[in-house]
Amino acid sequence: MPAYGLTYRFRFPVALRRRRRSRFSGGSLYARRRRRRVRVKGGFLPALIPLGAALISAIPGIASVAMQASQLKK
């Protein structure tokens, strides 16, 4: 079979936008840490909503395992 029908595709990362160097490009770790910190919006309650949904969806599975374990002991 001839090899001319084979196509290779390569992906190369390309920098589309260059960042300007900041004033704190030296050894100032405090400025870097402060800049990376992102405040979580919404507070504590929106973080609990996915956990509550996961618990509600897991209840039938937990109950079935408990029922099977109790039936095996009899």
UniProtKB/Swiss-Prot annotation:
Q: Where is this site: Cleavage?
A: 27-28, 43-44
What is the role of this chain? The role of the precursor might be to condense the viral prochromatin for encapsidation by virtue of the two basic domains.
Q: What does UniProt give as GO cellular component?
A: viral nucleocapsid
Question: Which residues are removed as the propeptide when the protein matures?
Answer: 1-27, 44-74
Q: Which family does it belong to?
A: Belongs to the adenoviridae pX family.
Keyword DNA-binding in annotation: yes
Q: What is its main location?
A: virion
- Record's protein name: Late L2 mu core protein
Q: Which UniProt keywords apply?
A: DNA-binding, Late protein, Virion
Show the coiled coil region(s). none
- Where located? Virion
Q: Does the keyword Cytoplasm apply?
A: no
